[in-house]
C-alpha cells in the first residue's frame, strides 16, 4: 500500500513541477513572444493560414472571437456526423463495422466536438478506422477551441481599456501546433514502445494456451490515446477505455496517461500568472483548486483501500482493498486517484469501472463533476473558475460596501447576471435531466421510439444505485466529462438525444458567458489599484472563492447525492 501511495504522490508532484515551465511557455505563445521552437512551427502555421485564407494578424473583439469559435465547431460537427452515419460504406473499415444510427451519430459527433467523448458505443465494433481518425482530429479541435477561448480571456484581463483581444484563429492554431501536437507525440511514442498498437490492419487472430482462437482488435490506438489525455478528451479507442490492456498496458503507461491529463490544466493556471505578470494570483487559484481536489481524492483513496464492508461481514479478507471492477496491475490507490483526477479535470477516461466504485468514491466522482471548477479541461477549466471569481468579487464588494472591482475593472449588474446564469445552468441541466429520467423509470413508462420497452429496462441496478447511474449520466454530460456508471443501458434514442442536448448547452453557454464578461470588462475604463482595492492574490480572497464554490456549486446537489450514493453508503453499513 505504501508503494501505491508513493506512486500517486509522485505523479501529482511531477505534474506540478513540469506544469510551471510549460505554463511559462504557453504564456509566451499567447503573448507572441519568441520561443526556441519558432523556427519549426512558424513555417507550418504560415502554410496553414495561407491555404485556409485566414488573416491571423486581424485583431478581433469578443463577439468576433465567439463567431469564429462557433463556426469552426459547426463545420466539424456536420462533417463528423455524416462520416459516422455512412462509415459502413466508406474506406478504412477492415473489420466491416456498420454505420451508426442517426441518434448515436448525433450523440457521438457532439460528444467529441465538445470535449466530452461520452461514447454510447464500443470502439472495437462501433466505429471504423476512418471514424476513429476523424474523432481523433475532433479531440484536437475541442481542446484547441477551449484553450483559444481561455487565451482571449487572458488578453481581456490585462490592465488596459480595449476591445482588441487578439485573433481567435491564431490562438487556436498555435494551441494545436505548439502545445497539443508536440505533447501528444511524446505520449504516443511512450505508449507505442510500451505495447499499445499503432496499425491500420484489422483484427488479429491468435491461438491461446488452451488451443482456442481469439480475434484481437487493434488499430491506430497510440495516437488516439495520446490526444485523448493531453486534450482532456477521454474517449477510449477500445470499449474498456484505459482499463483495456492494449490501451494502458503497464503501471508506467498508467503514470504517463495520468500525467498527460494533468499537465495542461495545471499549466494553464500558471500561464495566467505569467501572462498577466501576476504569479501570486495564479498561485492562489491553484491553491484553491488543489485544496478542493485533495478534499475529493483523499476520501476516495481511503474508501477504496478499506474495501467493501458487505464483503468484510462475510469473513472474506480484502488485503488488496476493494478490487471489484479494477485492474490488478494498477491497484485501488492509483485507481481511486485516477477516478477523481479524470472527473475533476473533465477528461472522463477510466482505468476501472466507476460503476463498481464504493459509494463514497462514487459520490466524490459525482461531486467533482458537479462542482466543475477544480482544474477542469483544456482552457475551459479556467473559464469555469473565472465565473466563480466574478461572483466572489461581487459578494466581497457588497460585504465591505464598495463597488466590486476585478483587476482594475468595475463589476456591474450585467457581468453578475451573466455569471449567475452560468453558475445556475450547471445544476439546472443535471437535475432536470435526472428528474425526467427518474420520472419515466419510477412509472415504468412505455417509451415507444425512445427506448425498446419500458423505462425500467435501462436500469440494470434498481434502487439507490440505479438513481446514481441516471444522475451520473447527466452529470457527466453537463460537465463535458464522458465517464459513466456503465450499468445504465444508454445506447438508445432517449439517452442519445437528451444527453446530446445537455452536451451542447453545457459546452457553449459556459464558454459564451466568460467570453462576454471578459469582453465587457476589457472595454471598461481601467481604475488603478489603490489602498481600498480588493486584493485578489491573497489567502483571504482564495477562501472567499472556495466558499462561493461550496455554497453555489456543491450544496445545490446535496439532495440528489443523498438519494443516490449517500443512501447506498448507509445500506452497506
From Swiss-Prot:
Keywords: Cell inner membrane, Cell membrane, Ion transport, Membrane, Potassium, Potassium transport, Transmembrane, Transmembrane helix, Transport. The chain crosses the membrane at residues 3-23, 72-92, 134-154, 179-199, 256-276, 282-302, 380-400, 418-438, 501-521, 540-560. InterPro entries: KdpA. The keyword DNA damage does not apply. The keyword Cell inner membrane applies. GO terms for cellular component: plasma membrane. It is found in: Cell inner membrane. It holds the Pfam family KdpA. It comes from the Bacteria. Coiled coil: none annotated. One of its GO terms (molecular function) is P-type potassium transmembrane transporter activity. It is a multi-pass membrane protein. Part of the high-affinity ATP-driven potassium transport (or Kdp) system, which catalyzes the hydrolysis of ATP coupled with the electrogenic transport of potassium into the cytoplasm. This subunit binds the periplasmic potassium ions and delivers the ions to the membrane domain of KdpB through an intramembrane tunnel. HAMAP family: KdpA. Belongs to the KdpA family. The system is composed of three essential subunits: KdpA, KdpB and KdpC. This is Potassium-transporting ATPase potassium-binding subunit.
